[in-house]
Amino acid sequence: MAPAVMASSATTVAPFQGLKSTAGLPISCRSGSTGLSSVSNGGRIRCMQVWPIEGIKKFETLSYLPPLSTEALLKQVDYLIRSKWVPCLEFSKVGFVFREHNSSPGYYDGRYWTMWKLPMFGCTDATQVLNEVEEVKKEYPDAYVRVIGFDNMRQVQCVSFIAFRPPGCEESGKA
């Protein structure tokens, strides 16, 4: 048998005519001889602060806030659970990225912390996570503890924040 030949209907596309004219677009009013409009934030500039570049180490997502209270931690962990992320706990005595033996990044430069037990798959209650944080604090009182929200569908870490700082660390984040 001979193969059937189908007639395809070709659609014509209009040829490219170049960019459209901007003559129909509104022109913003320009004042002054420089052609730039003056933008002012008014009195709001006086209340803005710049984060110091020396002496204060930054941690995770919520590091610019004061230490989280138990209620605030519960709310953050509850958000993590409602977002269908798996809570994980990690701890480290250093808590910062550092390069001690080599100038290139590697496994032992502080980016990877030790995981506490296993990820809490199936966890539905934020108090379960905080109970585990308390266990880490008892076992390693001089270690930083962070909570991680892991999305097991996309295989990515979605959120990470410090849940506990050791007593030797000042509350502002100074080491």
Curated annotation (Swiss-Prot):
Set out the biological process GO terms recorded for this chain's protein: photorespiration; reductive pentose-phosphate cycle
| GO function term, MF aspect, one | ribulose-bisphosphate carboxylase activity
Where it sits in the cell: the answer is: Plastid, Chloroplast
Gene3D superfamilies for the chain:
Ribulose bisphosphate carboxylase, small subunit
* Transmembrane spans: none
Supply the alphabetized keyword list.
Calvin cycle, Carbon dioxide fixation, Chloroplast, Photorespiration, Photosynthesis, Plastid, Transit peptide
The UniProt entry's GO CC annotations, sorted and at most eight, read: chloroplast
Q: Transit peptide range?
A: 1-46
An example of a Pfam family matching this protein is RuBisCO_small
Function summary: RuBisCO catalyzes two reactions: the carboxylation of D-ribulose 1,5-bisphosphate, the primary event in carbon dioxide fixation, as well as the oxidative fragmentation of the pentose substrate. Both reactions occur simultaneously and in competition at the same active site. Although the small subunit is not catalytic it is essential for maximal activity.
Q: Which PANTHER family match?
A: RIBULOSE BISPHOSPHATE CARBOXYLASE SMALL CHAIN 1, CHLOROPLASTIC, RIBULOSE BISPHOSPHATE CARBOXYLASE SMALL SUBUNIT, CHLOROPLASTIC 2
The family assignment reads: Belongs to the RuBisCO small chain family.
Extra information:
The basic functional RuBisCO is composed of a large chain homodimer in a 'head-to-tail' conformation. In form I RuBisCO this homodimer is arranged in a barrel-like tetramer with the small subunits forming a tetrameric 'cap' on each end of the 'barrel'.
Q: Assembly and interactions?
A: Heterohexadecamer of 8 large and 8 small subunits.
According to UniProt, the name of this protein is Ribulose bisphosphate carboxylase small subunit, chloroplastic 2
Q: What organism is the protein native to?
A: Triticum aestivum (Wheat)
The organism's taxonomy opens as: Eukaryota, Viridiplantae, Streptophyta, Embryophyta, Tracheophyta
**Gene (name only):** RBCS2
